[in-house]
Curated annotation (Swiss-Prot):
Glycan-bearing residues: 37
Keywords, sorted A to Z: Glycoprotein, Membrane, Transmembrane, Transmembrane helix
Protein name in UniProt: Transmembrane protein 140
Organism of this sequence: Rattus norvegicus
Membrane topology note: Multi-pass membrane protein
Transmembrane segments: 13-33, 84-104, 118-138, 150-170
Entry GO terms, CC: membrane
Location (main, coarse): membrane
Protein's cellular compartments: Membrane
Lyase among keywords: no
Length: 184
């Protein structure tokens, strides 16, 4: 039994919206709920806003700020660019659902391209920011130290790539119907 073209368009649109919701929830979990911490173990906490190392002298974590991070070899500009990339990706991803809904309701290719542009920029920013941050702090990290925040950002990046491919393969439907509001 063949699925009609209308249902196929609606199913692909719903799948795309579900993927967008998953990306937003994964990025919100990692960057807001986990406060950007990629490693949060008892003797080490490293994230976009936390850099705490275990001090044997005092027997607890000692957190460092920008002046001390420069002494440790982490440039202030590099850390700021990594933060901008990762948190900017979340901000751009938040703006994706509205153009998608408008493109679906109005059958407008321009709004669809705007959503694809937001997703593409979000994907590039997330990959660049996360890579830069890992490059800057890798001498204190091990692969086994990376926690759920890191895993959710990696999964969000993979879903962003899948989402971009899906949006290119399933563009908005043709302008055949006159009453657009009933199709939303």
């Amino acid at each position: 039994m063949a699925i009609s073209r209308v249902w196929r368009n609606r199913l692909s649109f719903m799948a795309i919206m579900i993927l967008v919701a998953m990306v937003l929830s994964l990025m919100s979990y990692a960057l807001l709920w986990k406060a950007g911490n990629l490693t949060d173990v008892p003797n080490l906490r490293i994230g976009f806003y936390n850099f705490c190392l275990w001090k044997e002298d005092i027997g607890s974590l000692e957190c460092y700020n920008f002046p001390e991070l420069g002494v440790l070899g982490i440039p202030q500009v590099g850390l700021a660019l990594a933060r901008l990339g990762v948190y900017g990706a979340l901000v751009l991803a938040v703006f994706v659902p509205l153009p998608l809904l408008l493109a679906q309701c109005n059958s407008d290719e321009g709004e669809w391209r705007l959503a694809v542009g937001f997703l593409g920029a979000s994907s590039v920013l997330l990959a660049g920011g996360l890579s830069l941050f890992l490059f800057l702090v890798w001498k204190w990290l091990r692969l086994s130290f990376l926690g759920p925040g890191f895993l959710s950002l990696c999964l969000a990046q993979a879903l962003l790539i899948i989402l971009l491919m899906a949006m290119v393969m399933f563009p908005p439907r043709d302008k055949k119907d006159k009453n657009h509001w009933e199709n939303c």
